[in-house]
Amino acid sequence: VYKRQMGDVAGGLQFTYISLDDSRIVKSQLLGDGSRTTENRGAIPYSVFLDPPLSRVGLTEAEAVKKGHAVKVARLPAAAVPKAKVLRQTNGLLKAIVDAETGQLLGAHLFCAESQELINLLKLAIDAGIPYTELRDAVYTHPTMSEALNDLFTAVN
């Protein structure tokens, strides 16, 4: 099945980066091997640029349960993150939804400083099937918002 529309006219999420990926899909279909499709683009992150930004990727807790996953949830107040303190932006919350049986990250919701950057790391983790323990135990630079992942994923229960 060929993709016949790109961008906003194609329906679905109306983000610039979706239009960019649509063009990659069409190029793959017209000039390549056709291997790039909407089905293999992976989890789609998005951010709403509030103060602090709100970013999301993957499933919500309710969606995960509805799909039959037994879930574990982790929550971390943004005020617990050293970089948030440095930035004086301690309002917010980080939340992750994990499959209780496989340890796979199913979704994340970040309402915190620099969430628009951090969400992309979690998108890659979802797409690559990286278990939450890898994110929990990784070494991150300090002070950065990404080091919040150590504490967030330690809170999985």
What are these regions (language model features)?
Residues G7-D8, G107:
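Conserved phosphate-binding and hydrolysis motifs of nucleotide-dependent enzymes
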Residues G11, S35-R36, R41-G42, A78-V81:
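Short beta-turn/strand-loop junction motif enriched in small, turn-promoting residues
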Residues G11-L13, Y17:
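An anion/pyrophosphate-binding glycine-rich loop and adjacent beta-alpha core
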Residues I44, F49-N157:
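Flexible, glycine-rich terminal cap/loop adjacent to redox cofactors
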